[in-house]
Amino acid sequence: MGNKIARTTQVSATEYYLHDLPSSYNLVLKEVLGRGRFLKSIQCKHDEGLVVVKVYFKRGDSIDLREYERRLVKIKDVFLSLEHPHVWPFQFWQETDKAAYLVRQYFYSNLHDRLSTRPFLSLVEKKWLAFQLLLAVKQCHEKDICHGDIKCENVLLTSWNWLYLADFASFKPTYIPYDDPSDFSFFFDTRGQRLCYLAPERFYEHGGETQVAQDAPLKPSMDIFAVGCVIAELFLEGQPLFELAQLLAYRRGQHDPSQHLEKIPDPGIRKMILHMIQLEPEARLSAEDYLQNYVGVVFPNYFSPFLHTLYCCWNPLPSDMRVATCQGIFQEILKKMMENKSGDEIGVDSPVTSNPMNASTVQETFANHKLNSSKDLIRNTVNSKDEIFYSISDALKKNRHPFLKKITMDDLGTLMSLYDSRSDTYGTPFLPVEGNMRCEGMVLIASMLCSCIRNIKLPHLRREAILLLRSCSLYIDDDDRLQRVLPYVVALLSDPTAIVRCAAMETLCDILPLVRDFPPSDAKIFPEYIFPMLSMLPEDTEESVRICYASNIAKLALTAYGFLIHSFQLSDVGVLNELNSQQISTTPASETPSHLQKANGNAQLQQLRKTIAEVVQELVMGPKQTPNVRRALLQDIGELCFFFGQRQSNDFLLPILPAFLNDRDEQLRSVFFEKIVYVCFFVGQRSVEEYLLPYIDQALSDQTEAVIVNALECLSTLCKSSFLRKRALLQMIECVYPLLCYPSQWVRRAVVTFIAASSECLGAVDSYAFIAPVIRSYLSRLPASIASEEGLLSCLKPPVTREVVYRIFEKTRNPEFMAKQRKMWYSSSPQSKDWESVDLFDKDAGELNSVECRAEQKQSVEGKKQIKSASKQPEVQGKYAEKDAKLRIPRNPRPNASNTVELRDPVYPEKLQFSGFMAPYVSGANSFIEPENIPLYSFSMDKRAATNPPVASESSLQMNSLGMGSLSVPWMDSMSKSFNLASSVPVPKLISGSFHVGTNPKQFYRVVHEPESRENDQISSAISKFQDLGVSSSSKSASVTSEDASSPADLVGEPSLSRTSVPDSGWKPRGVLVAHLQEHRSAVNDIATSSDHSFFVSASDDSTVKVWDSRKLEKDISFRSRLTYHLEGSRGMCTTMLRNSTQVVVGASDGVIHMFSIDHISRGLGNVVEKYSGIVDIKKKDVKEGALVSLLNYTADSLSGPMVMYSTQNCGIHLWDTRSDLDAWTLKANPEEGYVSSLVTSPCGNWFVSGSSRGVLTLWDLRFRVPVNSWQYPIICPIEKMCLCFLPPSVSVSTTMKPLIYVAAGCNEVSLWNAEGGSCHQVLRVANYENETDVSEFQWKLPSNKVNPKPNHRQNMSSKYRIEELNEPPPRLPGIRSLLPLPGGDLLTGGTDLKIRRWDYSSPERSYCICGPSLKGVGNDDFYELKTNTGVQFVQETKRRPLATKLTAKAVLAAAATDTAGCHRDSVQSLASVKLNQRLLISSSRDGAIKVWK
């Protein structure tokens, strides 16, 4: 082609480049790459991918291009025989009349572009590319082909650093004129920058006739010179070695490039480059000689044959197989790369020696891991994942935080001494990194993994690739970690597979602590890059990802803190290179926080802590928190405290601790008390005594032994560290010592350890003054030293059953007992302390075990006298012997009718009355006690509860044994709170743990805030409330009737009662409107209140469930709901709240039960809810039986978990265990009787009554799960609502034993039924103005119509199943829609006449209307007539003055719309009550309004 081509003229525009090319090539112009004068380079789209097209336009004289085409064919054919080529010739060419085209595959990157692209090439990568470039030239020269135009643009690179030499210039002239730069510019200066890579001998003198043929063949030495220039530019960070003028001067000997090469630090590289660019061509070596001579000097030994052969095997494999094979031979790769290091560098005494590995050995090793059995390889990849990473670094084996401070108990003392109060920090979190872990070759493996990680199809192989990157990161430098590996790891945080996201999270947290040196531009990598990318993980759909994030948040926090400290150091020093990783790691921890004194530094630290605090709060209290997530977060709570500092730990970590204990998960509570000791040291002594000790105190009564032991170990650690003051220590000893008789040896040993540590902390004198009198009753003898664990263990009395331990435990928490104990401690006569303690314990033990003793004695009076005389022996030895005997008695209580309560404590009857258990023993009702005389469907309590009377402070325990919490009883609130305050410290108390009797533990967790000064007031107010109920407070003549005793338990299973506690006796709402809540857009079908009355929820037809803060009902003018839960388009039919918890259960019209928890934070005195955090623990159950019709709490002593009974539209009745998420049992109602529209269950859980949509009421025996009685309501109509009837104390015991229920059905009436016989006792009728023809009284006189359970097959199917209702459903009769029972048989009702009435059972004439529309000209002058007919009592509401005109429903609605008192304007659907400063009535209506009355 020669100089003739140089005379061509300017050609057409680029739009016509492909105009002359045949359409069969299917090329589409995409981009113009180069506008050189000789060839135009364009990028085109082809069916097989992107291609580069070099275009030569023909102009002027015609030139024969066949010779150049022959050379292209030769080059292509020769290189086809290469097995693993580093050359890439032109693949296609085409000549047309106007142009010639050269086509090859497009490569994304060439060496020129790669040198200026992040991440910049590391030193070993540059050596690897130089090595491959020499290999490429060697392959060319071995085939007698010279390139002719080697430059950076013609060196192509793949993403995994495989090099190709392309664009062979067989058509360019070999020699060009020395004194005419036009030819150089035309052929070789494509960028116009005058860079020259040509050998000096390719320039000739232009004077006269030339002595050199321009088309003479190229020589290998010319390519070697160009290779030297490219390698020099590679190691000079893209700076060219020669420009044209410099090369010509160098040819004349007027330029020395060695000065420019001095910028290359490696002398071996400089020597090799200088040898390649010698002026004498003969002095230059061949490419093969350079490869051999500079092995070990420039090129590492493992480059050839090991690494090159490995890459040759990887090239043809897909990404998945590359990762799989890399995983299989990773250890061999690491071993080979570390071989050329000296013993000092790798941390051993002598250099590592190994057998040389040639190419065949490498291929054999690779083949052993390749596709002989690809499935086995992939399976081995999964099985051996741990061997890869954990066999590399001992540091990662031994410690979860290998390069960060791991907070242990041994280090806490030293750490506390480093605290800087001004900056609230504890020093730098980084630990030194060992220098012998550097292996530069790992960068090449990391680059290969990064190149294919996005194209891996199998998720487990993507995970393996991330783990391999984590392994490689141990051996590469900081810049490669941040610039090369980190972006790929962060990108995989959004991978669709959970295991990949987890692996990316773990790898991220393991890589970042390794970084010790980074440029100032990366100082804000955490706030601007890391944390935003992690923001979606707390709401990840997979729990495993959230657990992984929670377990690593402490690592992230400490690492971000270390980065922040280093950025301050960089700003102080000013020059990055002056700080290396060794200086950072050896900086004294006490000096590092001095940089945080700057205002900017403090602001950044506060912002960082705020960011981490938000993440922690989202994980702990967010909508997707689980016990496993919380447990993972607790594992590193010490590191989080280290990060937050003392002030932030108090301000942020302490308030969220109750959220951990509000969880039911036993393992979570166990881990909490295992790790809380770290929090104690960081928050300080005052916070421990005021906030954390009450938590530990309540953990001692937990049913899980691991929780108790961990709490005791925490106390022991605090004692050994002298962390507790004397007063706090004595208070904890008060709480702990009853556990000395715990049946588990594990717990007893933990108690002994704590007592011994306390003794050692107090000293010998105080130990015998304070500890010995308390524990003496539990020891057979006093040991020589209380501080000796072995001595205490050898002196312990035999253990007792767990029930007895909890009774003793609760007895010791009685304020009276604690007052006696403290009075004994601080008495002026120390010699009497021991004996007073013995007397005190005798009295307590006797009271606690009197029932057990009586149950095991015979019925004779002599036996009682023996017990009483034995308990009153004055001799100390006799007392000890009695205590030993009582503690050893096996607990097999059997009820005995003749047993009575022996009362030695003058206030003991009151205590029994408080707990609701006095009646079975003093009322003489043998039907409670005698097994053979127990009625089938009575209100009797569990036999186990009846034979084990409680102690005074056992209110919450006994309420739970009945299947209810003490907070479920409104009039028990103040008493139960005061009795549960076990410590005299006036700080928030946590009622946590599981008090239980027998086999029915009930767990509840609630923070109780009460001032100490109010305890006596609360007790006295509780006594006065019980006296108001008619309960005598005398000690001997207490006469409590059965209905009083059972009334607390009556809350169980009653639909409205289980949702809203039974209001106070004598409570008479006046109808004063307190609040009007109008957020629902449709009917509010049901209301449920929490056990502590702090909030209530409402379920509506508008597909929402709203949470309302009842504590602000009387305070806020603009009252709004706090939280809203959406039912996904279905209507909320019914709702209830599980007792002593914040869990809400909602039944929807689409047959789905929704259960969720309301997360809130309580602070200050009075347990005031400060913030509602959100709705958590969402659980859904699709019953697949149509709409949920009725829903209520069901709790019985024989059941361990919270149960929910519900009925469905398809006639199903189910009992759902909310813990196991399974149905305990399922019953089916008869379809001909209609679906079950209402349910009511007994307090003891032995029976329940169902009411159907066709007026059939059925009594079910739950012991055998069969219907035992069924009767038809006098009118065939739906049973709207049912509730239990709590009769007054004046009614005889025989009447109270009957299952009496109120039934709202029919037209404007409520009836009282005895479900045992199906007989009606009372009918309450509302005045019916629109239809004066009331139902005849005759139908109530008739005996109940028994429903035959056997179907009559002769009966017409249409009448049996009422098929006509499918065409036209029967209209609902106007009447009562909601019931709320009151003590003494009183009742609140609400219905379609928009009125709420209070019915008085004892004095029906005192019944009255609480609220309702005031009718014009009528007034609220209703009176209530009482009539009795054949045993049925009728209470009829009538007007004192007859109406002048007939009153219609439209007139009632018009009157309601103009009512000044604010009555309901539509049917009253639900009633509930809450007890705050005063009791309030809550009502909801069909128009979506909720009203609160007082």
UniProtKB/Swiss-Prot annotation:
Predominant place of localization: cytoplasm
Protein name as it appears in the record: Serine/threonine-protein kinase VPS15
Swiss-Prot/TrEMBL WD repeat ranges: 1079-1118, 1127-1166, 1184-1226, 1231-1270, 1276-1323, 1371-1409, 1466-1494
UniProt topology in membrane: Lipid-anchor
Organism listed in the record: Arabidopsis thaliana (Mouse-ear cress)
Compartmental location: Cytoplasm; Golgi apparatus, trans-Golgi network membrane; Endosome membrane
Binding site for ATP: 33-41, 54
Record key words, sorted: ATP-binding, Autophagy, Cytoplasm, Endosome, Golgi apparatus, Kinase, Lipoprotein, Membrane, Myristate, Nucleotide-binding, Phosphoprotein, Protein transport, Repeat, Serine/threonine-protein kinase, Transferase, Transport, WD repeat
PROSITE patterns in the cross-refs: HEAT_REPEAT, PROTEIN_KINASE_DOM, PROTEIN_KINASE_ST, WD_REPEATS_2, WD_REPEATS_REGION
Every Protein kinase domain range: 27-307
Family: Belongs to the protein kinase superfamily. Ser/Thr protein kinase family.
Chain segments carrying region Disordered: 859-903, 1037-1064
Catalytic activity: L-seryl-[protein] + ATP = O-phospho-L-seryl-[protein] + ADP + H(+); L-threonyl-[protein] + ATP = O-phospho-L-threonyl-[protein] + ADP + H(+)
SMART domains, A to Z: S_TKc (SM00220), WD40 (SM00320)
Active site: 149
BP terms from Gene Ontology: late endosome to vacuole transport; macroautophagy; pollen development; pollen germination; protein transport
Function: Serine/threonine-protein kinase required for cytoplasm to vacuole transport (Cvt) and autophagy as a part of the autophagy-specific VPS34 PI3-kinase complex I. Required for pollen development and germination, probably via the modulation of phosphatidylinositol 3-phosphate (PI3P) formation and vacuolar organization.
Known tissue expression: Mainly expressed in anthers, pollen grains and pollen tubes, and, to a lower extent, in other tissues and organs including seedlings, roots, stems, leaves, flowers, pitils and siliques.
Record InterPro entries: ARM-like, ARM-type_fold, HEAT_type_2, Kinase-like_dom_sf, Prot_kinase_dom, Ser/Thr_kinase_AS, Vps15-like, VPS15-like_hel
Lineage: Eukaryota, Viridiplantae, Streptophyta, Embryophyta, Tracheophyta
GO cellular component: Cul4-RING E3 ubiquitin ligase complex; cytoplasm; endosome membrane; Golgi apparatus; phosphatidylinositol 3-kinase complex
Quaternary assembly: Interacts with VPS34. Component of a complex made of VPS38/USL1 and PI3K main subunits such as VPS15, ATG6/VPS30 and VPS34.
Biased composition annotated in UniProt, kind: Low complexity: 1037-1047
UniProt modification remark: Autophosphorylated.
HEAT repeat start-end pairs: 383-421, 480-517, 524-562, 610-646, 648-685, 687-724, 727-764
